């Protein structure tokens, strides 16, 4: 009786699977997570002479109007634009979270990829808390999408 012939290799060994990759991402994400509610000193005093954004990133910077503004007005504009940016960040994070949750409705809840997505969902939620607390701390009302915009957001297919 002869030994069966060896089949030629189909190529190099397969690399990491999707689950292997998800496990690695999950472990890395957990190590880098933080809790902004406890990790940031929300009671620290704000420096009244400090910009909320780098001046060069403020919309009017470098214009004659910017040059005609007092430092206090420039700081206030940076404060308003900071809050606008954080407000937009909250709503983009919210859209991402909705998309992740909708996707996970169709996934295996025991899969490493699902666990990683849940970790990401938690991180995005903590970002929203951090942005909201920062907005509250600087004392400016957040910018919210109008009702019709929220309805459109809820109709997005992802």
PLM features: what roles do these ranges have?
Residues 1-101, 105-114, 137-144, 148:
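Terminal targeting/low-complexity segments that flank the catalytic cores of oxidoreductases
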């Amino acid at each position: 009786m002869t030994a069966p012939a060896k089949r030629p290799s189909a190529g190099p060994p397969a690399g990491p699977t999707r689950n292997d990759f998800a496990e690695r991402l999950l472990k890395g994400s957990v190590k880098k997570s933080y809790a902004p509610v406890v990790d940031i000193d929300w009671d620290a005093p704000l420096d009244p002479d400090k910009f909320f954004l780098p001046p060069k990133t403020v919309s009017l910077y470098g214009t004659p109007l910017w040059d005609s503004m007092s430092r206090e007005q420039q700081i206030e504009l940076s404060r308003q634009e900071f809050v606008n940016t954080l407000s937009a960040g909250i709503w983009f994070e919210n859209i991402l979270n909705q998309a992740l949750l909708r996707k996970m409705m169709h996934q295996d809840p025991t899969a490493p990829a699902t666990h990683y997505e849940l970790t990401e969902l938690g991180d995005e939620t903590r970002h929203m808390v951090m942005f909201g607390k920062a907005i509250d701390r600087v004392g400016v009302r957040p910018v919210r999408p109008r009702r019709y915009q929220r309805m459109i957001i809820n109709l997005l297919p992802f």
